[in-house]
């Protein structure tokens, strides 16, 4: 890959790698809680504390593919920097959701709701980027240049 192409995706790759570390942390918490109450073997059922950790991890894993798709789509089709920033915010609220779920379930609600909004924002960024691509393809009009012109005046 050339340097310019790398520069266009490096922030997205960093956010993706941070999300992998976060997933490993969540998995470690599940394993630790399982071994604490079930001995050496991993069981999917157990104490209420284990059930909360396992469910919180599973909920995060369920949303993870969607997050990766909209993160990379928004970064590639629209703009890398806002997509990477939104991705970092999503990881922050996902951490808040996970930790909140381990306490009372009502503590996890703000993280869950804000996480859904960030996913929606990334999705809309992706749609805007794809729409701009087709504007260029069919009409030769780059909407992104109009936005840059308006914002610099």
From Swiss-Prot:
Keyword DNA damage annotated: no
Database matches in InterPro entries: 5_LipOase_AP, FLAP/GST2/LTC4S_CS, MAPEG, MAPEG-like_dom_sf, Membr-assoc_MAPEG
Keyword Endoplasmic reticulum: yes
GO molecular function, one term: enzyme activator activity
Topology Lumenal: residue spans: 1-8, 78-80, 129-153
Cytoplasmic side stretches: 31-52, 103-107
Residue ranges of the TM segments: 9-30, 53-77, 81-102, 116-128
Quaternary structure annotation from Swiss-Prot or TrEMBL: Homotrimer. Interacts with LTC4S and ALOX5.
Comment field on protein domains: The C-terminal part after residue 140 is mostly disordered.
Listed name of the protein: Arachidonate 5-lipoxygenase-activating protein
Lineage per the UniProt record: Eukaryota, Metazoa, Chordata, Craniata, Vertebrata
């Amino acid at each position: 890959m050339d340097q310019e192409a790398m520069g266009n995706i490096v922030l997205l790759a960093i956010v993706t790698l941070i999300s992998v570390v976060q997933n490993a942390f969540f998995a470690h918490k599940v394993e630790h809680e399982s071994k604490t109450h079930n001995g050496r073997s991993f069981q999917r059922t157990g104490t209420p504390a284990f059930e909360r950790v396992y469910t919180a991890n599973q909920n995060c894993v369920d949303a993870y593919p969607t997050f990766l798709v909209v993160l990379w789509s928004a970064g590639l089709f629209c703009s890398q920097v806002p997509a990477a920033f939104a991705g970092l915010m999503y990881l922050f609220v996902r951490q808040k959701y996970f930790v909140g779920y381990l306490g009372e379930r009502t503590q996890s609600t703000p993280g869950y709701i804000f996480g859904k909004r960030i996913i929606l924002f990334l999705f809309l960024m992706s749609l805007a980027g794809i729409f701009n691509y087709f504007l260029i393809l069919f009409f030769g009009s780059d909407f992104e240049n109009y936005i840059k012109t308006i914002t610099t005046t």
